[in-house]
Amino acid sequence: MNFEIKDTNIRKIFDSRGNFSAEVTVILENASGTASAPAGASTGKTEVIAYPDNNIDNGIDFFYRHVKKALKGFNSINQEGLDRMLHEIDGTDNFSNLGGNIATAISIANAKAVSNALGIPMYRYVGGINYSMPRPIGNVIGGGKHSKNGTTIQEFLVSAQGKTVLDSIYYNILIHRRIGEILSGMFKNQSIGLGDEKAWTCDISDEDAIEIIKNASKDISSEYKIKVLNGVDFAADSFYDGNYYIYKNRKLTRDQQIDYAISISRDHGFYYIEDPLNDQDFDGFSEITSKVGDKSLIVGDDLYTTNPERIKKGIEKRSTNGVLIKVNQIGTLSDTARSVRIATEHGLKTVVSHRSGETTDDFIAHLAVAFGSPLIKTGTIGGERLAKLNELIRIEEELI
């Protein structure tokens, strides 16, 4: 079987916010693969550069001048070699010439092309025999950089633990609906809206949101006799001014923010706590994990940015017991797989995640299964979110 790359095409498409995204098609002799990259609103300082000078056209121009010809004839089954070549052609340590989003689209499209050529699903090609089904965790109340006039905390999340992925998705949707009913009752003469990730957003406090999500989860849990895990993504770096954590109605010192994050676990029983501190405070994360890591999953996103070296630092300091995984934070499938391998070898749980500006590409569903991640973070409703969730349903059907 011939795995040489015959051609590679790139085009501009639109993401869920109406912004441009890069989509790439890798063409082999008897198969092809197409992938597109999402975009984040709350981005970590150590992520690779999405597009050079924040301009997708500059990245596309670099692709045509330097990458397209180099890919032709390359053995596509050598994923690590292809990803290494992308780094070499770019010539920087953060993809500032090609753009990490374009590198991501090329890397994933290549893996899809090989999977299609072999006649196997992508999760099996990437994960081999080591795969398992994750449970979805989705945003139901949103704030921060995902909405205007919402909560300071960026995401309030639920993960219903149904017998199947289908059940879990359905129960998450029911909780989302229940929260909409609660908010409609609270704001009878005001409209409520949906944020970037289709979570409810309105002018409420973080404390109100905590109580609403607890009540909605309890309602669905009691009615359907299921367990529901609640969570938050603080995205704390986005409201940290260098000295204080600035909420709508107060500002907290570092120690007060640590205590608040701990109370989310101890006092409210939340299982999932992401980015409770700024993205340089490895020691502060360690303090939170040492106090409540036995009952809650403390997850680093901006702290790690899917970067193997930062994950190693977190392991050394025992900063978290969970790592968020986003391919376009690091730029290639091989780099992502390395980060996952380092994390899992040291007992950290991985959570494969979408971005707020998503496309309908479903590749993260396959990666979550391939990496054996216990959770996949990809919303509850919205076409670009359900594209991933529906693909999980199809994958589970294959595996049952």
Swiss-Prot record:
Belongs to the enolase family. Its EC number is 4.2.1.11. (2R)-2-phosphoglycerate binds at residues 154, 326, 355-356, 377. The active site is at residues 197, 326. PANTHER family: ENOLASE. One of its GO terms (cellular component) is phosphopyruvate hydratase complex. This is Enolase. InterPro entries: Enolase, Enolase-like_C_sf, Enolase-like_N, Enolase_C, Enolase_CS, Enolase_N. It is found in: Cytoplasm; Secreted; Cell surface. It comes from the Archaea. It catalyses: (2R)-2-phosphoglycerate = phosphoenolpyruvate + H2O. The keyword Repeat does not apply. The keyword ATP-binding does not apply. Transmembrane segments: none annotated. Its cofactor is Mg(2+). The lineage of its organism: Archaea, Methanobacteriati, Thermoplasmatota, Thermoplasmata, Thermoplasmatales. It comes from Picrophilus torridus (strain ATCC 700027 / DSM 9790 / JCM 10055 / NBRC 100828 / KAW 2/3). One of its GO terms (molecular function) is magnesium ion binding.
